[in-house]
C-alpha cells in the first residue's frame, strides 16, 4: 500500500448513498476512492454474511462499481485523523496511509439508538438492527423465543429476518400509538413500494402503544416486562432486541468542520455542507435507502460539477423526503421512555456508570470528569446517543485518533508536510 494516495473525489462510506455517489460521479472520469469499514459495499441495510439475502438491487450496484476502472475501493478501512486540509490518515488491517483529496462526500450512515432500562445489559439483549446483523453473520436462532421492542419499521424488518431463520416471535412492541401508526399506514400508498413492503412485513404479534419496562433474568435473559396498552405483562423469551430509532453518524463530519443541524449533518440543495465537502444518506437524517440513494447521486453529480444532472434529481429527493418526514413524525419517541432507567441502571457499559451518577450534571464534560461516562472502549458510541436523548447534552467534536490505531499508522503523520 502506498504511503500516500490522491483522490479527485473521496467517498467515506459504501452504503446506498456512497455507492450512488460513486456511480453518479464515475462518468466524469474523476479519480474516485471509496473507503468503508465493511468487507463489501452495501452498508448496514445490505449487509452481507453467510445467512444474508442481499437484494438484487445491491448486487447490481456492486457489479456497476466493479466495472468502473476509475473507482478504487478500500474495504475494512477506518479514518484515524485529519492531519491537514483535505487530507486524512486511514488504516486497514495491513497498513496505514495518507489520502489527499479535492472533494469529499461523507456517507457515514447511522447507528441504533439504545435507551437504558433495567436488565438491558443481560446476555441475550441486543439492538434490533444488531440482532438482524448477527443473524446475517450466522447466529443460529432456530426455535428461540424472541421479543422485539422499540420504535419504527426496523422492528418489523428485524422480526422478519428472525422468523425466516426459525425464531419464534413472541411480541413486536411498538411504542408509537395506534393512531400514529394508522396515520402513517394511510399515507403509504403515496410510495407504492413501501405500501407493498408493509404487507410483506406485517406480523400478528405486533402491538402499538407498547414499550419495554425491564429485561428479566439473573445470569442471562429469561423474560421481559412490557407495558402493553396500559397494562403490565411479562413474557418468557430467549432474546430481546430493542431499537429506538437511528442516530446519524456525524462524528467525522464534526471533526472536519461540517455544519450540524439537530443531530445530523446540515447540507444545502447540492448536498454540500461546506466548500468541496458534501454529505448524503442517513448522516444527514434518517429517511431510508431510497432517500439515501438519491441524495448520494445528487452529491456525486454536484461534486464533479454536473449540476444539471443533480438538479434533475431534486423532485425525486423531495418525494422521499416526504416519506422521511411522515416516518419521523409517526414514530417520534414518547417522553416517558426517558424515565425507563433506575438510579442503578447502567448507562455507560464500558465504564460501569449508572444513571444515578449522571443526574445533576449539566453537560458531557462535567459528567466525564466526575464519572468517566463515554470514555471507555466504545468512546461513547453506545451511551452517547442515550445520554443526548436523556439529558440533551450535545457531544463535542471527537479528537484524533477517531478510532484505535497502530503506532505504525500514527507514524505516517511524520510524512505530513507542515501547515
State what each model feature region is.
Residues 127-135, 239-287:
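FAD-site-proximal beta/loop scaffold in flavoenzymes
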Residues 65-90, 99, 165-251, 259-261:
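A Rossmann-like FAD-binding core segment of flavoenzymes
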Residues 270-273, 301-340:
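Active-site-proximal substrate-binding core of FAD-dependent oxidoreductases
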Residues 2-9, 47, 58-145, 223-230, ...:
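FAD-binding core/adjacent interface of flavoenzyme oxidoreductases
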Residues 344-358, 371-389:
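Local cysteine-cluster metal-coordination motifs and their immediate loop/turn environment
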Residues 280-315:
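A conserved FAD-binding loop/helix module that cradles the flavin
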Residues 2-3, 7-64, 143, 148-149, ...:
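Beta1-alpha1 glycine-rich phosphate/pyrophosphate-binding loop at the start
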Residues 15-16, 40, 112, 152-154, ...:
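Residue-level detector of alpha-helix initiation sites
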Amino acid at each position: 500500500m502506498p504511503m500516500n494516495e490522491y483522490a479527485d473525489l473521496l467517498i467515506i462510506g459504501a452504503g446506498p448513498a456512497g455507492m450512488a455517489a460513486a456511480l453518479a460521479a464515475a462518468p466524469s472520469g474523476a479519480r474516485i476512492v471509496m473507503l468503508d469499514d465493511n468487507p463489501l459495499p452495501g452498508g448496514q441495510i445490505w449487509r452481507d454474511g453467510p445467512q444474508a439475502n442481499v437484494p438484487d438491487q445491491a448486487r447490481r450496484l456492486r457489479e456497476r462499481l466493479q466495472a468502473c476502472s476509475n473507482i478504487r475501493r478500500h474495504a475494512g478501512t477506518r479514518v484515524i485523523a485529519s492531519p491537514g486540509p483535505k487530507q486524512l490518515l486511514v488504516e486497514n488491517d495491513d497498513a496505514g496511509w495518507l489520502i489527499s483529496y479535492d472533494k469529499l462526500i461523507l456517507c457515514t450512515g447511522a447507528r441504533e439508538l439504545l435507551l437504558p432500562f433495567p436488565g438491558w445489559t443481560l446476555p441475550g439483549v441486543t439492538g434490533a438492527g444488531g440482532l438482524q446483523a448477527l443473524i446475517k453473520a450466522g447466529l443460529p436462532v432456530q426455535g428461540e423465543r424472541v421479543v422485539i421492542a422499540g420504535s419504527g419499521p426496523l422492528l418489523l424488518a428485524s422480526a422478519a429476518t428472525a422468523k425466516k431463520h426459525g425464531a419464534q416471535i413472541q411480541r413486536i412492541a411498538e411504542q408509537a400509538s395506534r393512531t400514529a401508526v394508522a396515520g402513517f399506514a394511510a399515507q403509504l400508498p403515496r410510495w407504492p413500494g413501501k405500501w407493498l413492503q408493509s404487507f410483506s412485513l406485517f406480523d400478528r404479534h405486533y402491538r402499538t402503544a407498547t414499550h419495554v419496562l425491564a429485561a428479566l433474568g439473573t445470569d442471562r435473559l429469561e423474560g421481559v416486562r412490557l407495558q402493553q396498552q396500559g397494562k403490565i405483562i411479562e413474557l418468557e423469551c430467549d432474546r430481546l432486541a430493542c431499537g429506538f430509532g437511528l442516530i446519524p453518524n456525524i462524528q467525522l463530519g464534526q471533526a472536519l468542520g461540517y455544519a450540524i443541524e439537530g443531530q445530523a449533518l446540515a447540507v444545502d440543495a447540492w448536498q454540500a455542507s461546506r466548500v468541496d465537502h458534501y454529505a448524503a444518506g442517513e448522516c444527514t437524517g434518517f429517511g431510508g435507502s431510497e432517500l439515501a440513494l438519491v441524495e448520494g447521486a445528487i452529491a456525486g453529480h454536484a461534486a464533479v460539477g454536473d449540476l444539471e444532472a443533480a438538479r434533475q434529481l431534486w423532485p425525486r429527493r423531495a418525494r422521499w423526503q416526504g416519506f422521511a418526514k411522515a416516518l419521523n413524525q409517526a414514530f417520534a419517541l414518547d417522553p416517558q421512555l426517558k424515565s425507563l432507567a433506575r438510579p442503578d441502571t447502567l448507562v455507560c457499559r464500558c465504564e460501569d456508570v449508572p444513571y444515578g451518577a449522571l443526574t445533576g450534571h449539566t453537560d458531557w464534560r462535567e459528567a466525564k470528569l466526575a464519572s468517566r461516562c463515554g470514555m471507555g472502549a466504545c468512546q461513547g458510541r453506545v451511551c452517547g446517543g442515550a445520554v443526548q436523548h436523556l439529558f440533551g447534552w450535545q457531544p463535542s467534536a471527537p479528537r484524533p485518533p477517531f478510532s484505535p490505531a497502530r503506532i505504525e499508522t500514527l507514524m505516517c503523520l511524520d510524512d505530513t508536510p507542515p501547515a
